[in-house]
């Protein structure tokens, strides 16, 4: 059975173009979402994925209607393949029921993996370069060591953690982490 999925990014956009194309392609059922592709919560996609069974074909108007990213798209199509479900994108002329369509997705998978590895490599190189210049990754600490020592002295002098937290605008739980209860009486 051919089952379609349409998605538009906003409620103001119309699904008619995609829906007509899927109906012309022979889709018996069509599920839809009106949400950004970056959103993970897409109820229409969840429903169509539950509905599909071995031998079915998931049909979309265009690749970007299905996946949030190349990596997400490749993972999704691999999951479909593992379940014995084919995938077809009408405007991109991709059909995983054909040898050429399967080959195309193998290439896409390799490209997505390479992209992920390049991102990891660039991130590591950037962090290494920053460390070599004496910079440490992450945001700057909210308090300098001197401020933490002031907090410690207040706690040592019996000031309750709650008061210290209010004075320095820090969570009481942070004070417990930084200065364990066994260290002080408060």
Swiss-Prot record:
Residues 1-134 form the Resolvase/invertase-type recombinase catalytic domain. The active site is at 9 (o-(5'-phospho-dna)-serine intermediate). Residues 161-180 bind DNA. GO terms for molecular function: DNA binding; DNA strand exchange activity. One of its GO terms (biological process) is viral tropism switching. Belongs to the site-specific recombinase resolvase family. Performs inversion of a viral 3 kp segment (C-segment) that encodes two alternate pairs of tail fiber proteins thereby modifying the host specificity of the virus. This is DNA-invertase. It comes from Enterobacteria phage P7. The gene is cin.
């Amino acid at each position: 059975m051919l089952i379609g999925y349409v998605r538009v990014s906003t409620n103001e956009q119309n699904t008619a173009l995609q829906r007509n194309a899927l109906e012309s392609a022979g889709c018996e059922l069509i599920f839809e979402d009106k949400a950004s592709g970056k959103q993970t919560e897409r109820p229409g996609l969840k429903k169509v994925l539950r509905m599909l069974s071995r031998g079915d074909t998931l049909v979309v108007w265009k690749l970007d209607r299905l996946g949030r990213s190349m990596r997400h798209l490749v993972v999704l199509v691999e999951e479909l393949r593992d379940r014995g479900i084919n995938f077809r994108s009408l405007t991109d002329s991709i059909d995983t029921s054909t040898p050429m369509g399967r080959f195309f997705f193998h290439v896409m998978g390799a490209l997505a993996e390479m992209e992920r590895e390049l991102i990891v490599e660039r991130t590591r190189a950037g962090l290494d370069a920053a460390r070599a210049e004496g910079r440490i990754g992450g945001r700057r600490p909210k308090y300098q060591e001197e401020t933490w020592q002031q907090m410690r002295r207040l706690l040592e002098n019996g000031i309750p953690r709650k008061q210290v937290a209010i004075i320095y605008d820090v969570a009481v739980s942070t004070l417990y982490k930084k200065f364990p209860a066994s260290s002080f009486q408060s």
